[in-house]
């Protein structure tokens, strides 16, 4: 049997993405677990807006001592990347670093195309087309070595979600529709407070009345007491920022 180190990197990325979905929501502003089914992703996001989010396991997988895992001849972080990293507050930087380590499976301090795509999926995002991940890496990869280091990710992630690169990243509408139907138990096109509470409990995330009230207030932007698909989509689209605590940047 092949060891973890011997197995192909791509196989381990897929396995890591599949297996990281069993954490329980608890600590506010913690990192999202790796991507799973659309309904589970939606449940995590709705739980976030109740004041708790899914926590990636506490182990900083792949972490090495300072100086280890550096590629020979690897370019130092650019001044722009260092400035971008400085924009993040300490807790934000810690959370982002946990996510980075989770997907840097061989611990070499950088993300490949496949690892970056898996990280984006863990935040509820996906490349709009397969070849556009190359454009995302090019936009983030300040030193041009073909991979993404942590300083580059810290510098670029807010712009990736909010700025000029946004057309390259999209919330998966088909998966959102599937998740919405799981909450909309009577199929009338809206999620009521009762449906939301029952769905959260059924999916293993029971919520109290105060949490339910907060969730409805956050999602129900028109104040009609129901969550429409458009409102559901909006709350999901902002989840990546909230997971990382970047919304205030």
Curated annotation (Swiss-Prot):
Ca(2+) 2 binds at residues 141, 143, 145, 147, 152. The keyword Hydrolase does not apply. Residues 30-56 have a biased composition (Low complexity). SUPFAM superfamilies: EF-hand. It comes from the Eukaryota. Pfam families: EF-hand_7 (PF13499). Disulfide bonds: none annotated. One of its GO terms (molecular function) is calcium ion binding. Residues 91-126, 128-163, 171-206, 207-242 form the EF-hand domain. Ca(2+) 1 binds at residues 104, 106, 108, 110, 115. Residues 1-80 are annotated as: Disordered. Potential calcium sensor. This is Probable calcium-binding protein CML12. It comes from Oryza sativa subsp. japonica (Rice).
């Amino acid at each position: 049997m092949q060891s973890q180190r011997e197995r192909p990197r791509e196989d381990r990325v897929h396995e890591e993405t599949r297996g990281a979905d069993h954490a329980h929501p608890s600590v506010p502003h913690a990192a999202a677990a790796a991507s799973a089914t659309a309904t589970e992703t939606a449940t995590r996001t709705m739980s976030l807006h109740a004041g708790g989010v899914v926590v990636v396991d506490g182990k900083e997988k792949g972490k090495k001592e300072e100086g280890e895992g550096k590629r020979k001849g690897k370019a130092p972080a650019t001044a722009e990347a260092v400035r971008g990293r400085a924009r993040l507050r300490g807790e934000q930087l810690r959370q982002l670093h946990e996510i980075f380590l989770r997907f840097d499976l061989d611990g070499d301090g950088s993300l490949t195309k496949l690892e970056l795509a898996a990280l984006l999926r863990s935040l509820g995002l996906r490349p709009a087309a397969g070849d556009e991940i190359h454009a995302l890496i090019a936009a983030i990869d300040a030193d041009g070595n073909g991979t993404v280091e942590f300083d580059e990710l810290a510098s670029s992630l807010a712009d990736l979600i909010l700025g000029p690169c946004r057309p390259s990243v999209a919330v998966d509408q088909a998966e959102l529709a599937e998740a919405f139907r799981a909450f909309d138990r009577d199929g009338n096109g809206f999620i009521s407070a009762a449906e939301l509470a029952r769905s959260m409990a059924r999916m293993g995330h029971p919520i109290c009345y105060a949490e339910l009230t907060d969730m409805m207030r956050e999602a129900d932007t028109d104040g009609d007491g129901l969550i429409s698909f458009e409102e559901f989509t909006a709350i999901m689209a902002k989840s990546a920022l909230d997971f990382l605590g970047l919304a205030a940047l």
